[in-house]
Swiss-Prot record:
Belongs to the histone H3 family. InterPro entries: Histone-fold (IPR009072), Histone_H2A/H2B/H3 (IPR007125), Histone_H3/CENP-A (IPR000164). It comes from Dictyostelium discoideum (Social amoeba). This is Histone H3.v1. SUPFAM superfamilies: Histone-fold. Residues 1-15 have a biased composition (Basic and acidic residues). GO terms for molecular function: DNA binding; protein heterodimerization activity; structural constituent of chromatin. It holds the Pfam family Histone. Residues 230-287 have a biased composition (Acidic residues). GO terms for cellular component: centrosome; nucleosome; nucleus. The gene is H3v1.
Length: 619
């Protein structure tokens, strides 16, 4: 302990060597008296400059530290023990920065402060923080010359380990290493962090190039991203504008189409109204002209009622047809080309009516025989009075009805009736054979009339009710009377159709009812016989009622629910079979008894549940 140098002696040696000046060093030491926190950091590189506190004038420092008293030998930090410096040995100077730095580390690593520090010596040392000698020296607050020498020695260590900085540093005691660089050595000093103003770190041209390239790339990326985003936004806006324009155009087209359709519908409605007005005018004119054609005589009352009834029917039919057409137009909404087709059809149908008006002399021809028939009642004595009255009344009614109903005919009927009109000569011929009673037998086959004389009158009176078929019916009746063998076919077909329709379903119903009833009874008897035979056989035998294979499958399924590795012996399976049969037979017997007590012959689920409850209490 006596050989250990005191701090005052060490400082004297430093002053002698020229590493400390009296006025400026005092200021520096006062600044260093303030407590500072040491941060663990990596060693500084050769690029960092030495620390110079503000307000100090740098004196050229020799890289040699003279120790006034050194003990016999100095040991390395890796070796065991510590070499101590004493004041007995003389001062020695070393040449070269590398040797000086090594000597400073060697000497500073051997310093140990075991004495209690005084007030004056607080500014020259600090307590040791770590156990390694290099960290002891680095953690102590020492003058600038010692720190410079330590930095010089650390430069050699960094160069040997190829530690290269990647980014500019804000402090000289922090470094950033590349990802692929090796880890720093274990024996690295932890330098104190200085809070004073520092000079900027010098960057190598390589680092400057890299940083500039990175900045340019980042700028290019950001600009390209901004440009691309701007372009995308512009494209999206253009697409949206185009879509909006297309939608507007489509809406305009739809509106135009709707307007066109509405106009067409209005035109069609106007045309229909005009046609209806024309029809009404024609009907009124014909009604006015009817008494003039009949020789100024008023028409009978039944004919007027038939006229008005037919007029109402025709108007209702026309209105229904127009409503159907309008519904079809509204529901389907065809294209304008399809809608324009019915217009020419209407134009074609209008001239047909004018032709009918031009051919108006036809009804007077039918009415012309009225005075002739009125003059010849005595000449035709063979015909009975009923026949004459019916024949005289029928042409008048038919002529009046035909004259009154011609305007109310539908468009299709006008086309059909025009070719079927017969000249007046055929009409007169068809009336003459009615007077002969020998040709009347075909009418006797129709069961509707009791007397043969009433048949022609009924035919002639009933036909005018149908608007357009009156003329062809009269022609058919005339031909049928002239040719008797052809008439039975028409009359027989109508009568046979009316007779056969109700008879056919009755026969079929009888067949369907008879077929299922006959085989049911023998089947029931057979089933009963089979069941009875099976019961007798089972009573006399000792075999099991439950088959073995289905029961074994069911047992295996139940076993698999608990565990897959379970197995069963045949004896156990036989025992299960016997117990299940015994349980089922007991259940059926007892439930049968319960059903018989209830007055039933069939077993129900209620009986089984009752047996289970009773078994639970009994056993």
């Amino acid at each position: 302990m006596a050989n250990k140098p005191k701090p005052s002696e060490h400082l004297r040696d430093l002053i002698r060597s020229g590493q400390r000046t009296s006025p400026e060093a005092d200021l520096q030491l006062k600044q260093q008296q303030q407590p500072r926190q040491t941060q663990p950091s990596r060693p500084s590189s050769s690029l960092t400059q030495s620390y110079e506190p503000p307000g100090t004038t740098r004196v050229p420092v020799s890289p040699v530290i003279s120790t006034s008293e050194s003990s016999g030998s100095s040991r390395s930090p890796a070796s065991s023990g510590s070499s101590r410096s004493s004041g007995s040995s003389g001062s020695s100077r070393l040449s070269g920065s590398s040797r000086a730095s090594v000597n400073t580390i060697m000497n500073l690593s051997n310093i140990e402060f075991n004495d209690t520090p005084s007030v004056t010596d607080d500014s020259y040392y600090t307590n040791v923080m770590t156990e390694s000698p290099i960290r002891k020296a680095a953690s102590q607050r020492l003058p600038t010359g010692v720190m410079d020498s330590i930095r010089g020695s650390l430069e050699n260590i960094n160069v040997s380990h190829n530690l290269t900085p990647t980014t500019p540093l804000s402090k000289p005691n922090t470094l950033m290493y590349k990802k692929g660089a090796p880890a720093p050595p274990r024996l690295t000093p932890i330098l104190p962090s200085y809070k004073t103003n520092l000079k900027p770190v010098v960057q190598t041209p390589k680092i400057q190039r890299k940083t500039s390239q990175i900045e340019e790339e980042s700028d290019d990326d950001s600009s390209s991203q901004n440009n691309s985003s701007d372009q995308e936004e512009e494209e999206e806006e253009e697409e949206e504008e185009e879509e909006e324009e297309e939608e507007e155009e489509e809406e305009e087209e739809e509106e135009e189409e709707e307007e066109e359709e509405e106009e067409e519908e209005e035109e069609e409605e106007e045309e229909e109204e005009e046609e209806e007005e024309e029809e009404e005018e024609e009907e009124e004119e014909e009604v006015r002209e009817a008494p003039k054609r009949s020789g100024g005589k008023p028409l009978p009352s039944p004919s007027l009622s038939s006229i008005f009834s037919n007029y109402d029917e025709s108007s209702s039919v026309a209105s229904s047809e127009s409503s159907k057409q309008s519904r079809v137009k509204v529901s389907k909404k065809p294209s304008p080309l399809i809608k324009k087709k019915p217009a020419p059809i209407k134009k074609v149908t209008t001239p047909t009516r004018s032709k009918q008006q031009q051919q108006s002399p036809l009804p007077p021809t039918r009415r012309s025989p009225l005075p002739s028939e009125a003059k010849k009642p005595a000449a035709s004595k063979k015909v009975s009075k009923n026949v004459l009255s019916s024949s005289s009344s029928s042409p008048s009614s038919s002529s009046s009805s035909s004259s009154s109903l011609t305007p109310t005919k539908s468009r299709r009927e006008t086309i059909v009736t025009t070719p079927t009109k017969t000249p007046p000569s055929t009409r007169s011929k068809s009336i003459t054979p009615l007077s002969t009673p020998t040709r009347t037998p075909p009418s006797t086959r129709s069961k509707t009339s009791s007397t043969p004389s009433s048949t022609p009158s009924s035919l002639s009176i009933s036909t005018p009710s149908s608007t357009s078929i009156s003329s062809p019916v009269s022609s058919r009746t005339s031909t049928s009377i002239l040719t008797p063998p052809s008439t039975p076919t028409s009359t027989h077909s109508s009568t046979s159709a009316s007779i056969t329709t109700p008879t056919t379903p009755r026969i079929r119903v009888q067949r369907t009812t008879t077929t299922p009833t006959t085989p049911t009874t023998p089947r029931k008897k057979r089933r009963r016989r089979l069941v009875a035979s099976v019961i007798r056989r089972l009573r006399n035998s000792v075999d099991f009622m439950i088959p073995r294979l289905p029961l074994s499958r069911l047992v295996r399924e139940i076993m698999c629910l608990f565990d897959d590795g379970l197995r069963i012996t045949p004896g156990a399976l036989l025992a299960i079979q016997t117990t299940t049969e015994a349980y089922l037979t007991r259940l059926m017997e007892d439930s049968g008894l319960l059903a018989s007590h209830a007055g039933r012959k069939t077993i129900r689920s209620v009986d089984m549940y009752a047996w289970k409850r009773a078994r639970h209490f009994l056993f």
